[in-house]
């Protein structure tokens, strides 16, 4: 496996990242593999040289993080041998502060994710969506503090407009806070809107691109027709 730098960081990742949305609990979605069915695939990924694993707190409502963490602890020789990413934003409960990018929720969410994953830190902590109800200054400072607390090595973003991503980066730069190093955007041969603004922005700024749904949820793999 040839490894590449994630954006302009020094972090080495496999060109293929195993997305963990399909691993967790079939009670959440009927297309999700339960733990026993997930583990052989995760093990095979590690044996093939894949060292990059991306999950989120909301995948199977936390079960994906638990399954991912247990498998990586069992199959990887050392914590240093894999790059672990997770995300924050989506609802994790019924409470008004169980979602979003408020300072409160980010702090609560990173601790909960680390407990479920069974690790002391994640390599990449990503905001899953843009929060229209929280000032970006609050979110970026909270993410900076997560990094400074040693709970995340880098931060990234996912699924937003290019102007929003640029605003977040400018906010962080203006205040001397940690900036995003990666963008996880929706991109494949069917959905190519990201070629208009987001991808050129990221290439210009040295931001790592982690496209989600690269096979268009199976359409490009030939196993779905609708």
Report the location of each language-model feature:
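Structural motif corresponding to the early beta-alpha repeats
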Residues: 75-101
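Short, acidic/polar
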Residues: 31-45, 99-118, 141, 165-170
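Beta/alpha (TIM)-barrel catalytic core signal, keyed to glycine-rich beta->alpha loops juxtaposed to Asp/Glu
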Residues: 3, 134-226
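Active-site mouth loops of central-metabolism enzymes
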Residues: 22-36, 92-107, 128-133
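N-terminal binding-site loop/beta-alpha segment at the start of enzyme catalytic domains
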Residues: 1-82, 120, 148
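Short acidic capping loops at alpha-helix termini that bridge into adjacent secondary structure
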Residues: 14-15, 77-82, 86, 120-124, ...
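Active-site gating/metal-coordination segments in enzymes
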Residues: 93-126, 178, 186, 190-193
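Conserved, mostly hydrophobic/aromatic
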Residues: 6, 18, 38, 45, ...
């Amino acid at each position: 496996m040839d490894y590449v730098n994630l954006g302009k960081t020094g972090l080495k990742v496999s060109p293929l990242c195993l997305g963990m949305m399909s691993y967790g609990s079939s009670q959440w979605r009927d297309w999700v593999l339960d733990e026993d069915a997930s583990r052989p695939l995760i093990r095979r990924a590690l044996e093939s040289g894949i060292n990059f694993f991306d999950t989120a707190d909301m995948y199977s409502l936390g079960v994906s993080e638990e399954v991912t963490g247990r498998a990586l602890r069992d199959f990887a020789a050392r914590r240093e041998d894999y790059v672990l990413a997770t995300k924050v934003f989506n609802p994790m409960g019924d409470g008004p502060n169980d979602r979003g990018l408020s300072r409160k929720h980010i702090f609560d969410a990173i601790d909960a994710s680390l407990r479920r994953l069974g690790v002391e830190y994640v390599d990449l902590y990503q905001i899953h969506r843009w929060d229209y109800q929280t000032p970006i200054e609050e979110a970026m400072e909270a993410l900076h503090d997560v990094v400074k607390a040693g709970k995340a090595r880098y931060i990234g973003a996912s699924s937003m407009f290019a102007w929003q991503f640029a605003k977040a980066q400018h906010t962080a730069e203006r205040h001397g806070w940690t900036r995003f190093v990666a963008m996880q955007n929706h991109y494949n041969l069917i959905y190519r809107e990201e070629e208009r603004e987001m991808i050129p922005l990221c290439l210009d700024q040295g931001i790592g691109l982690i496209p989600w749904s690269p096979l268009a949820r199976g359409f490009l793999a030939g196993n779905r027709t609708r």
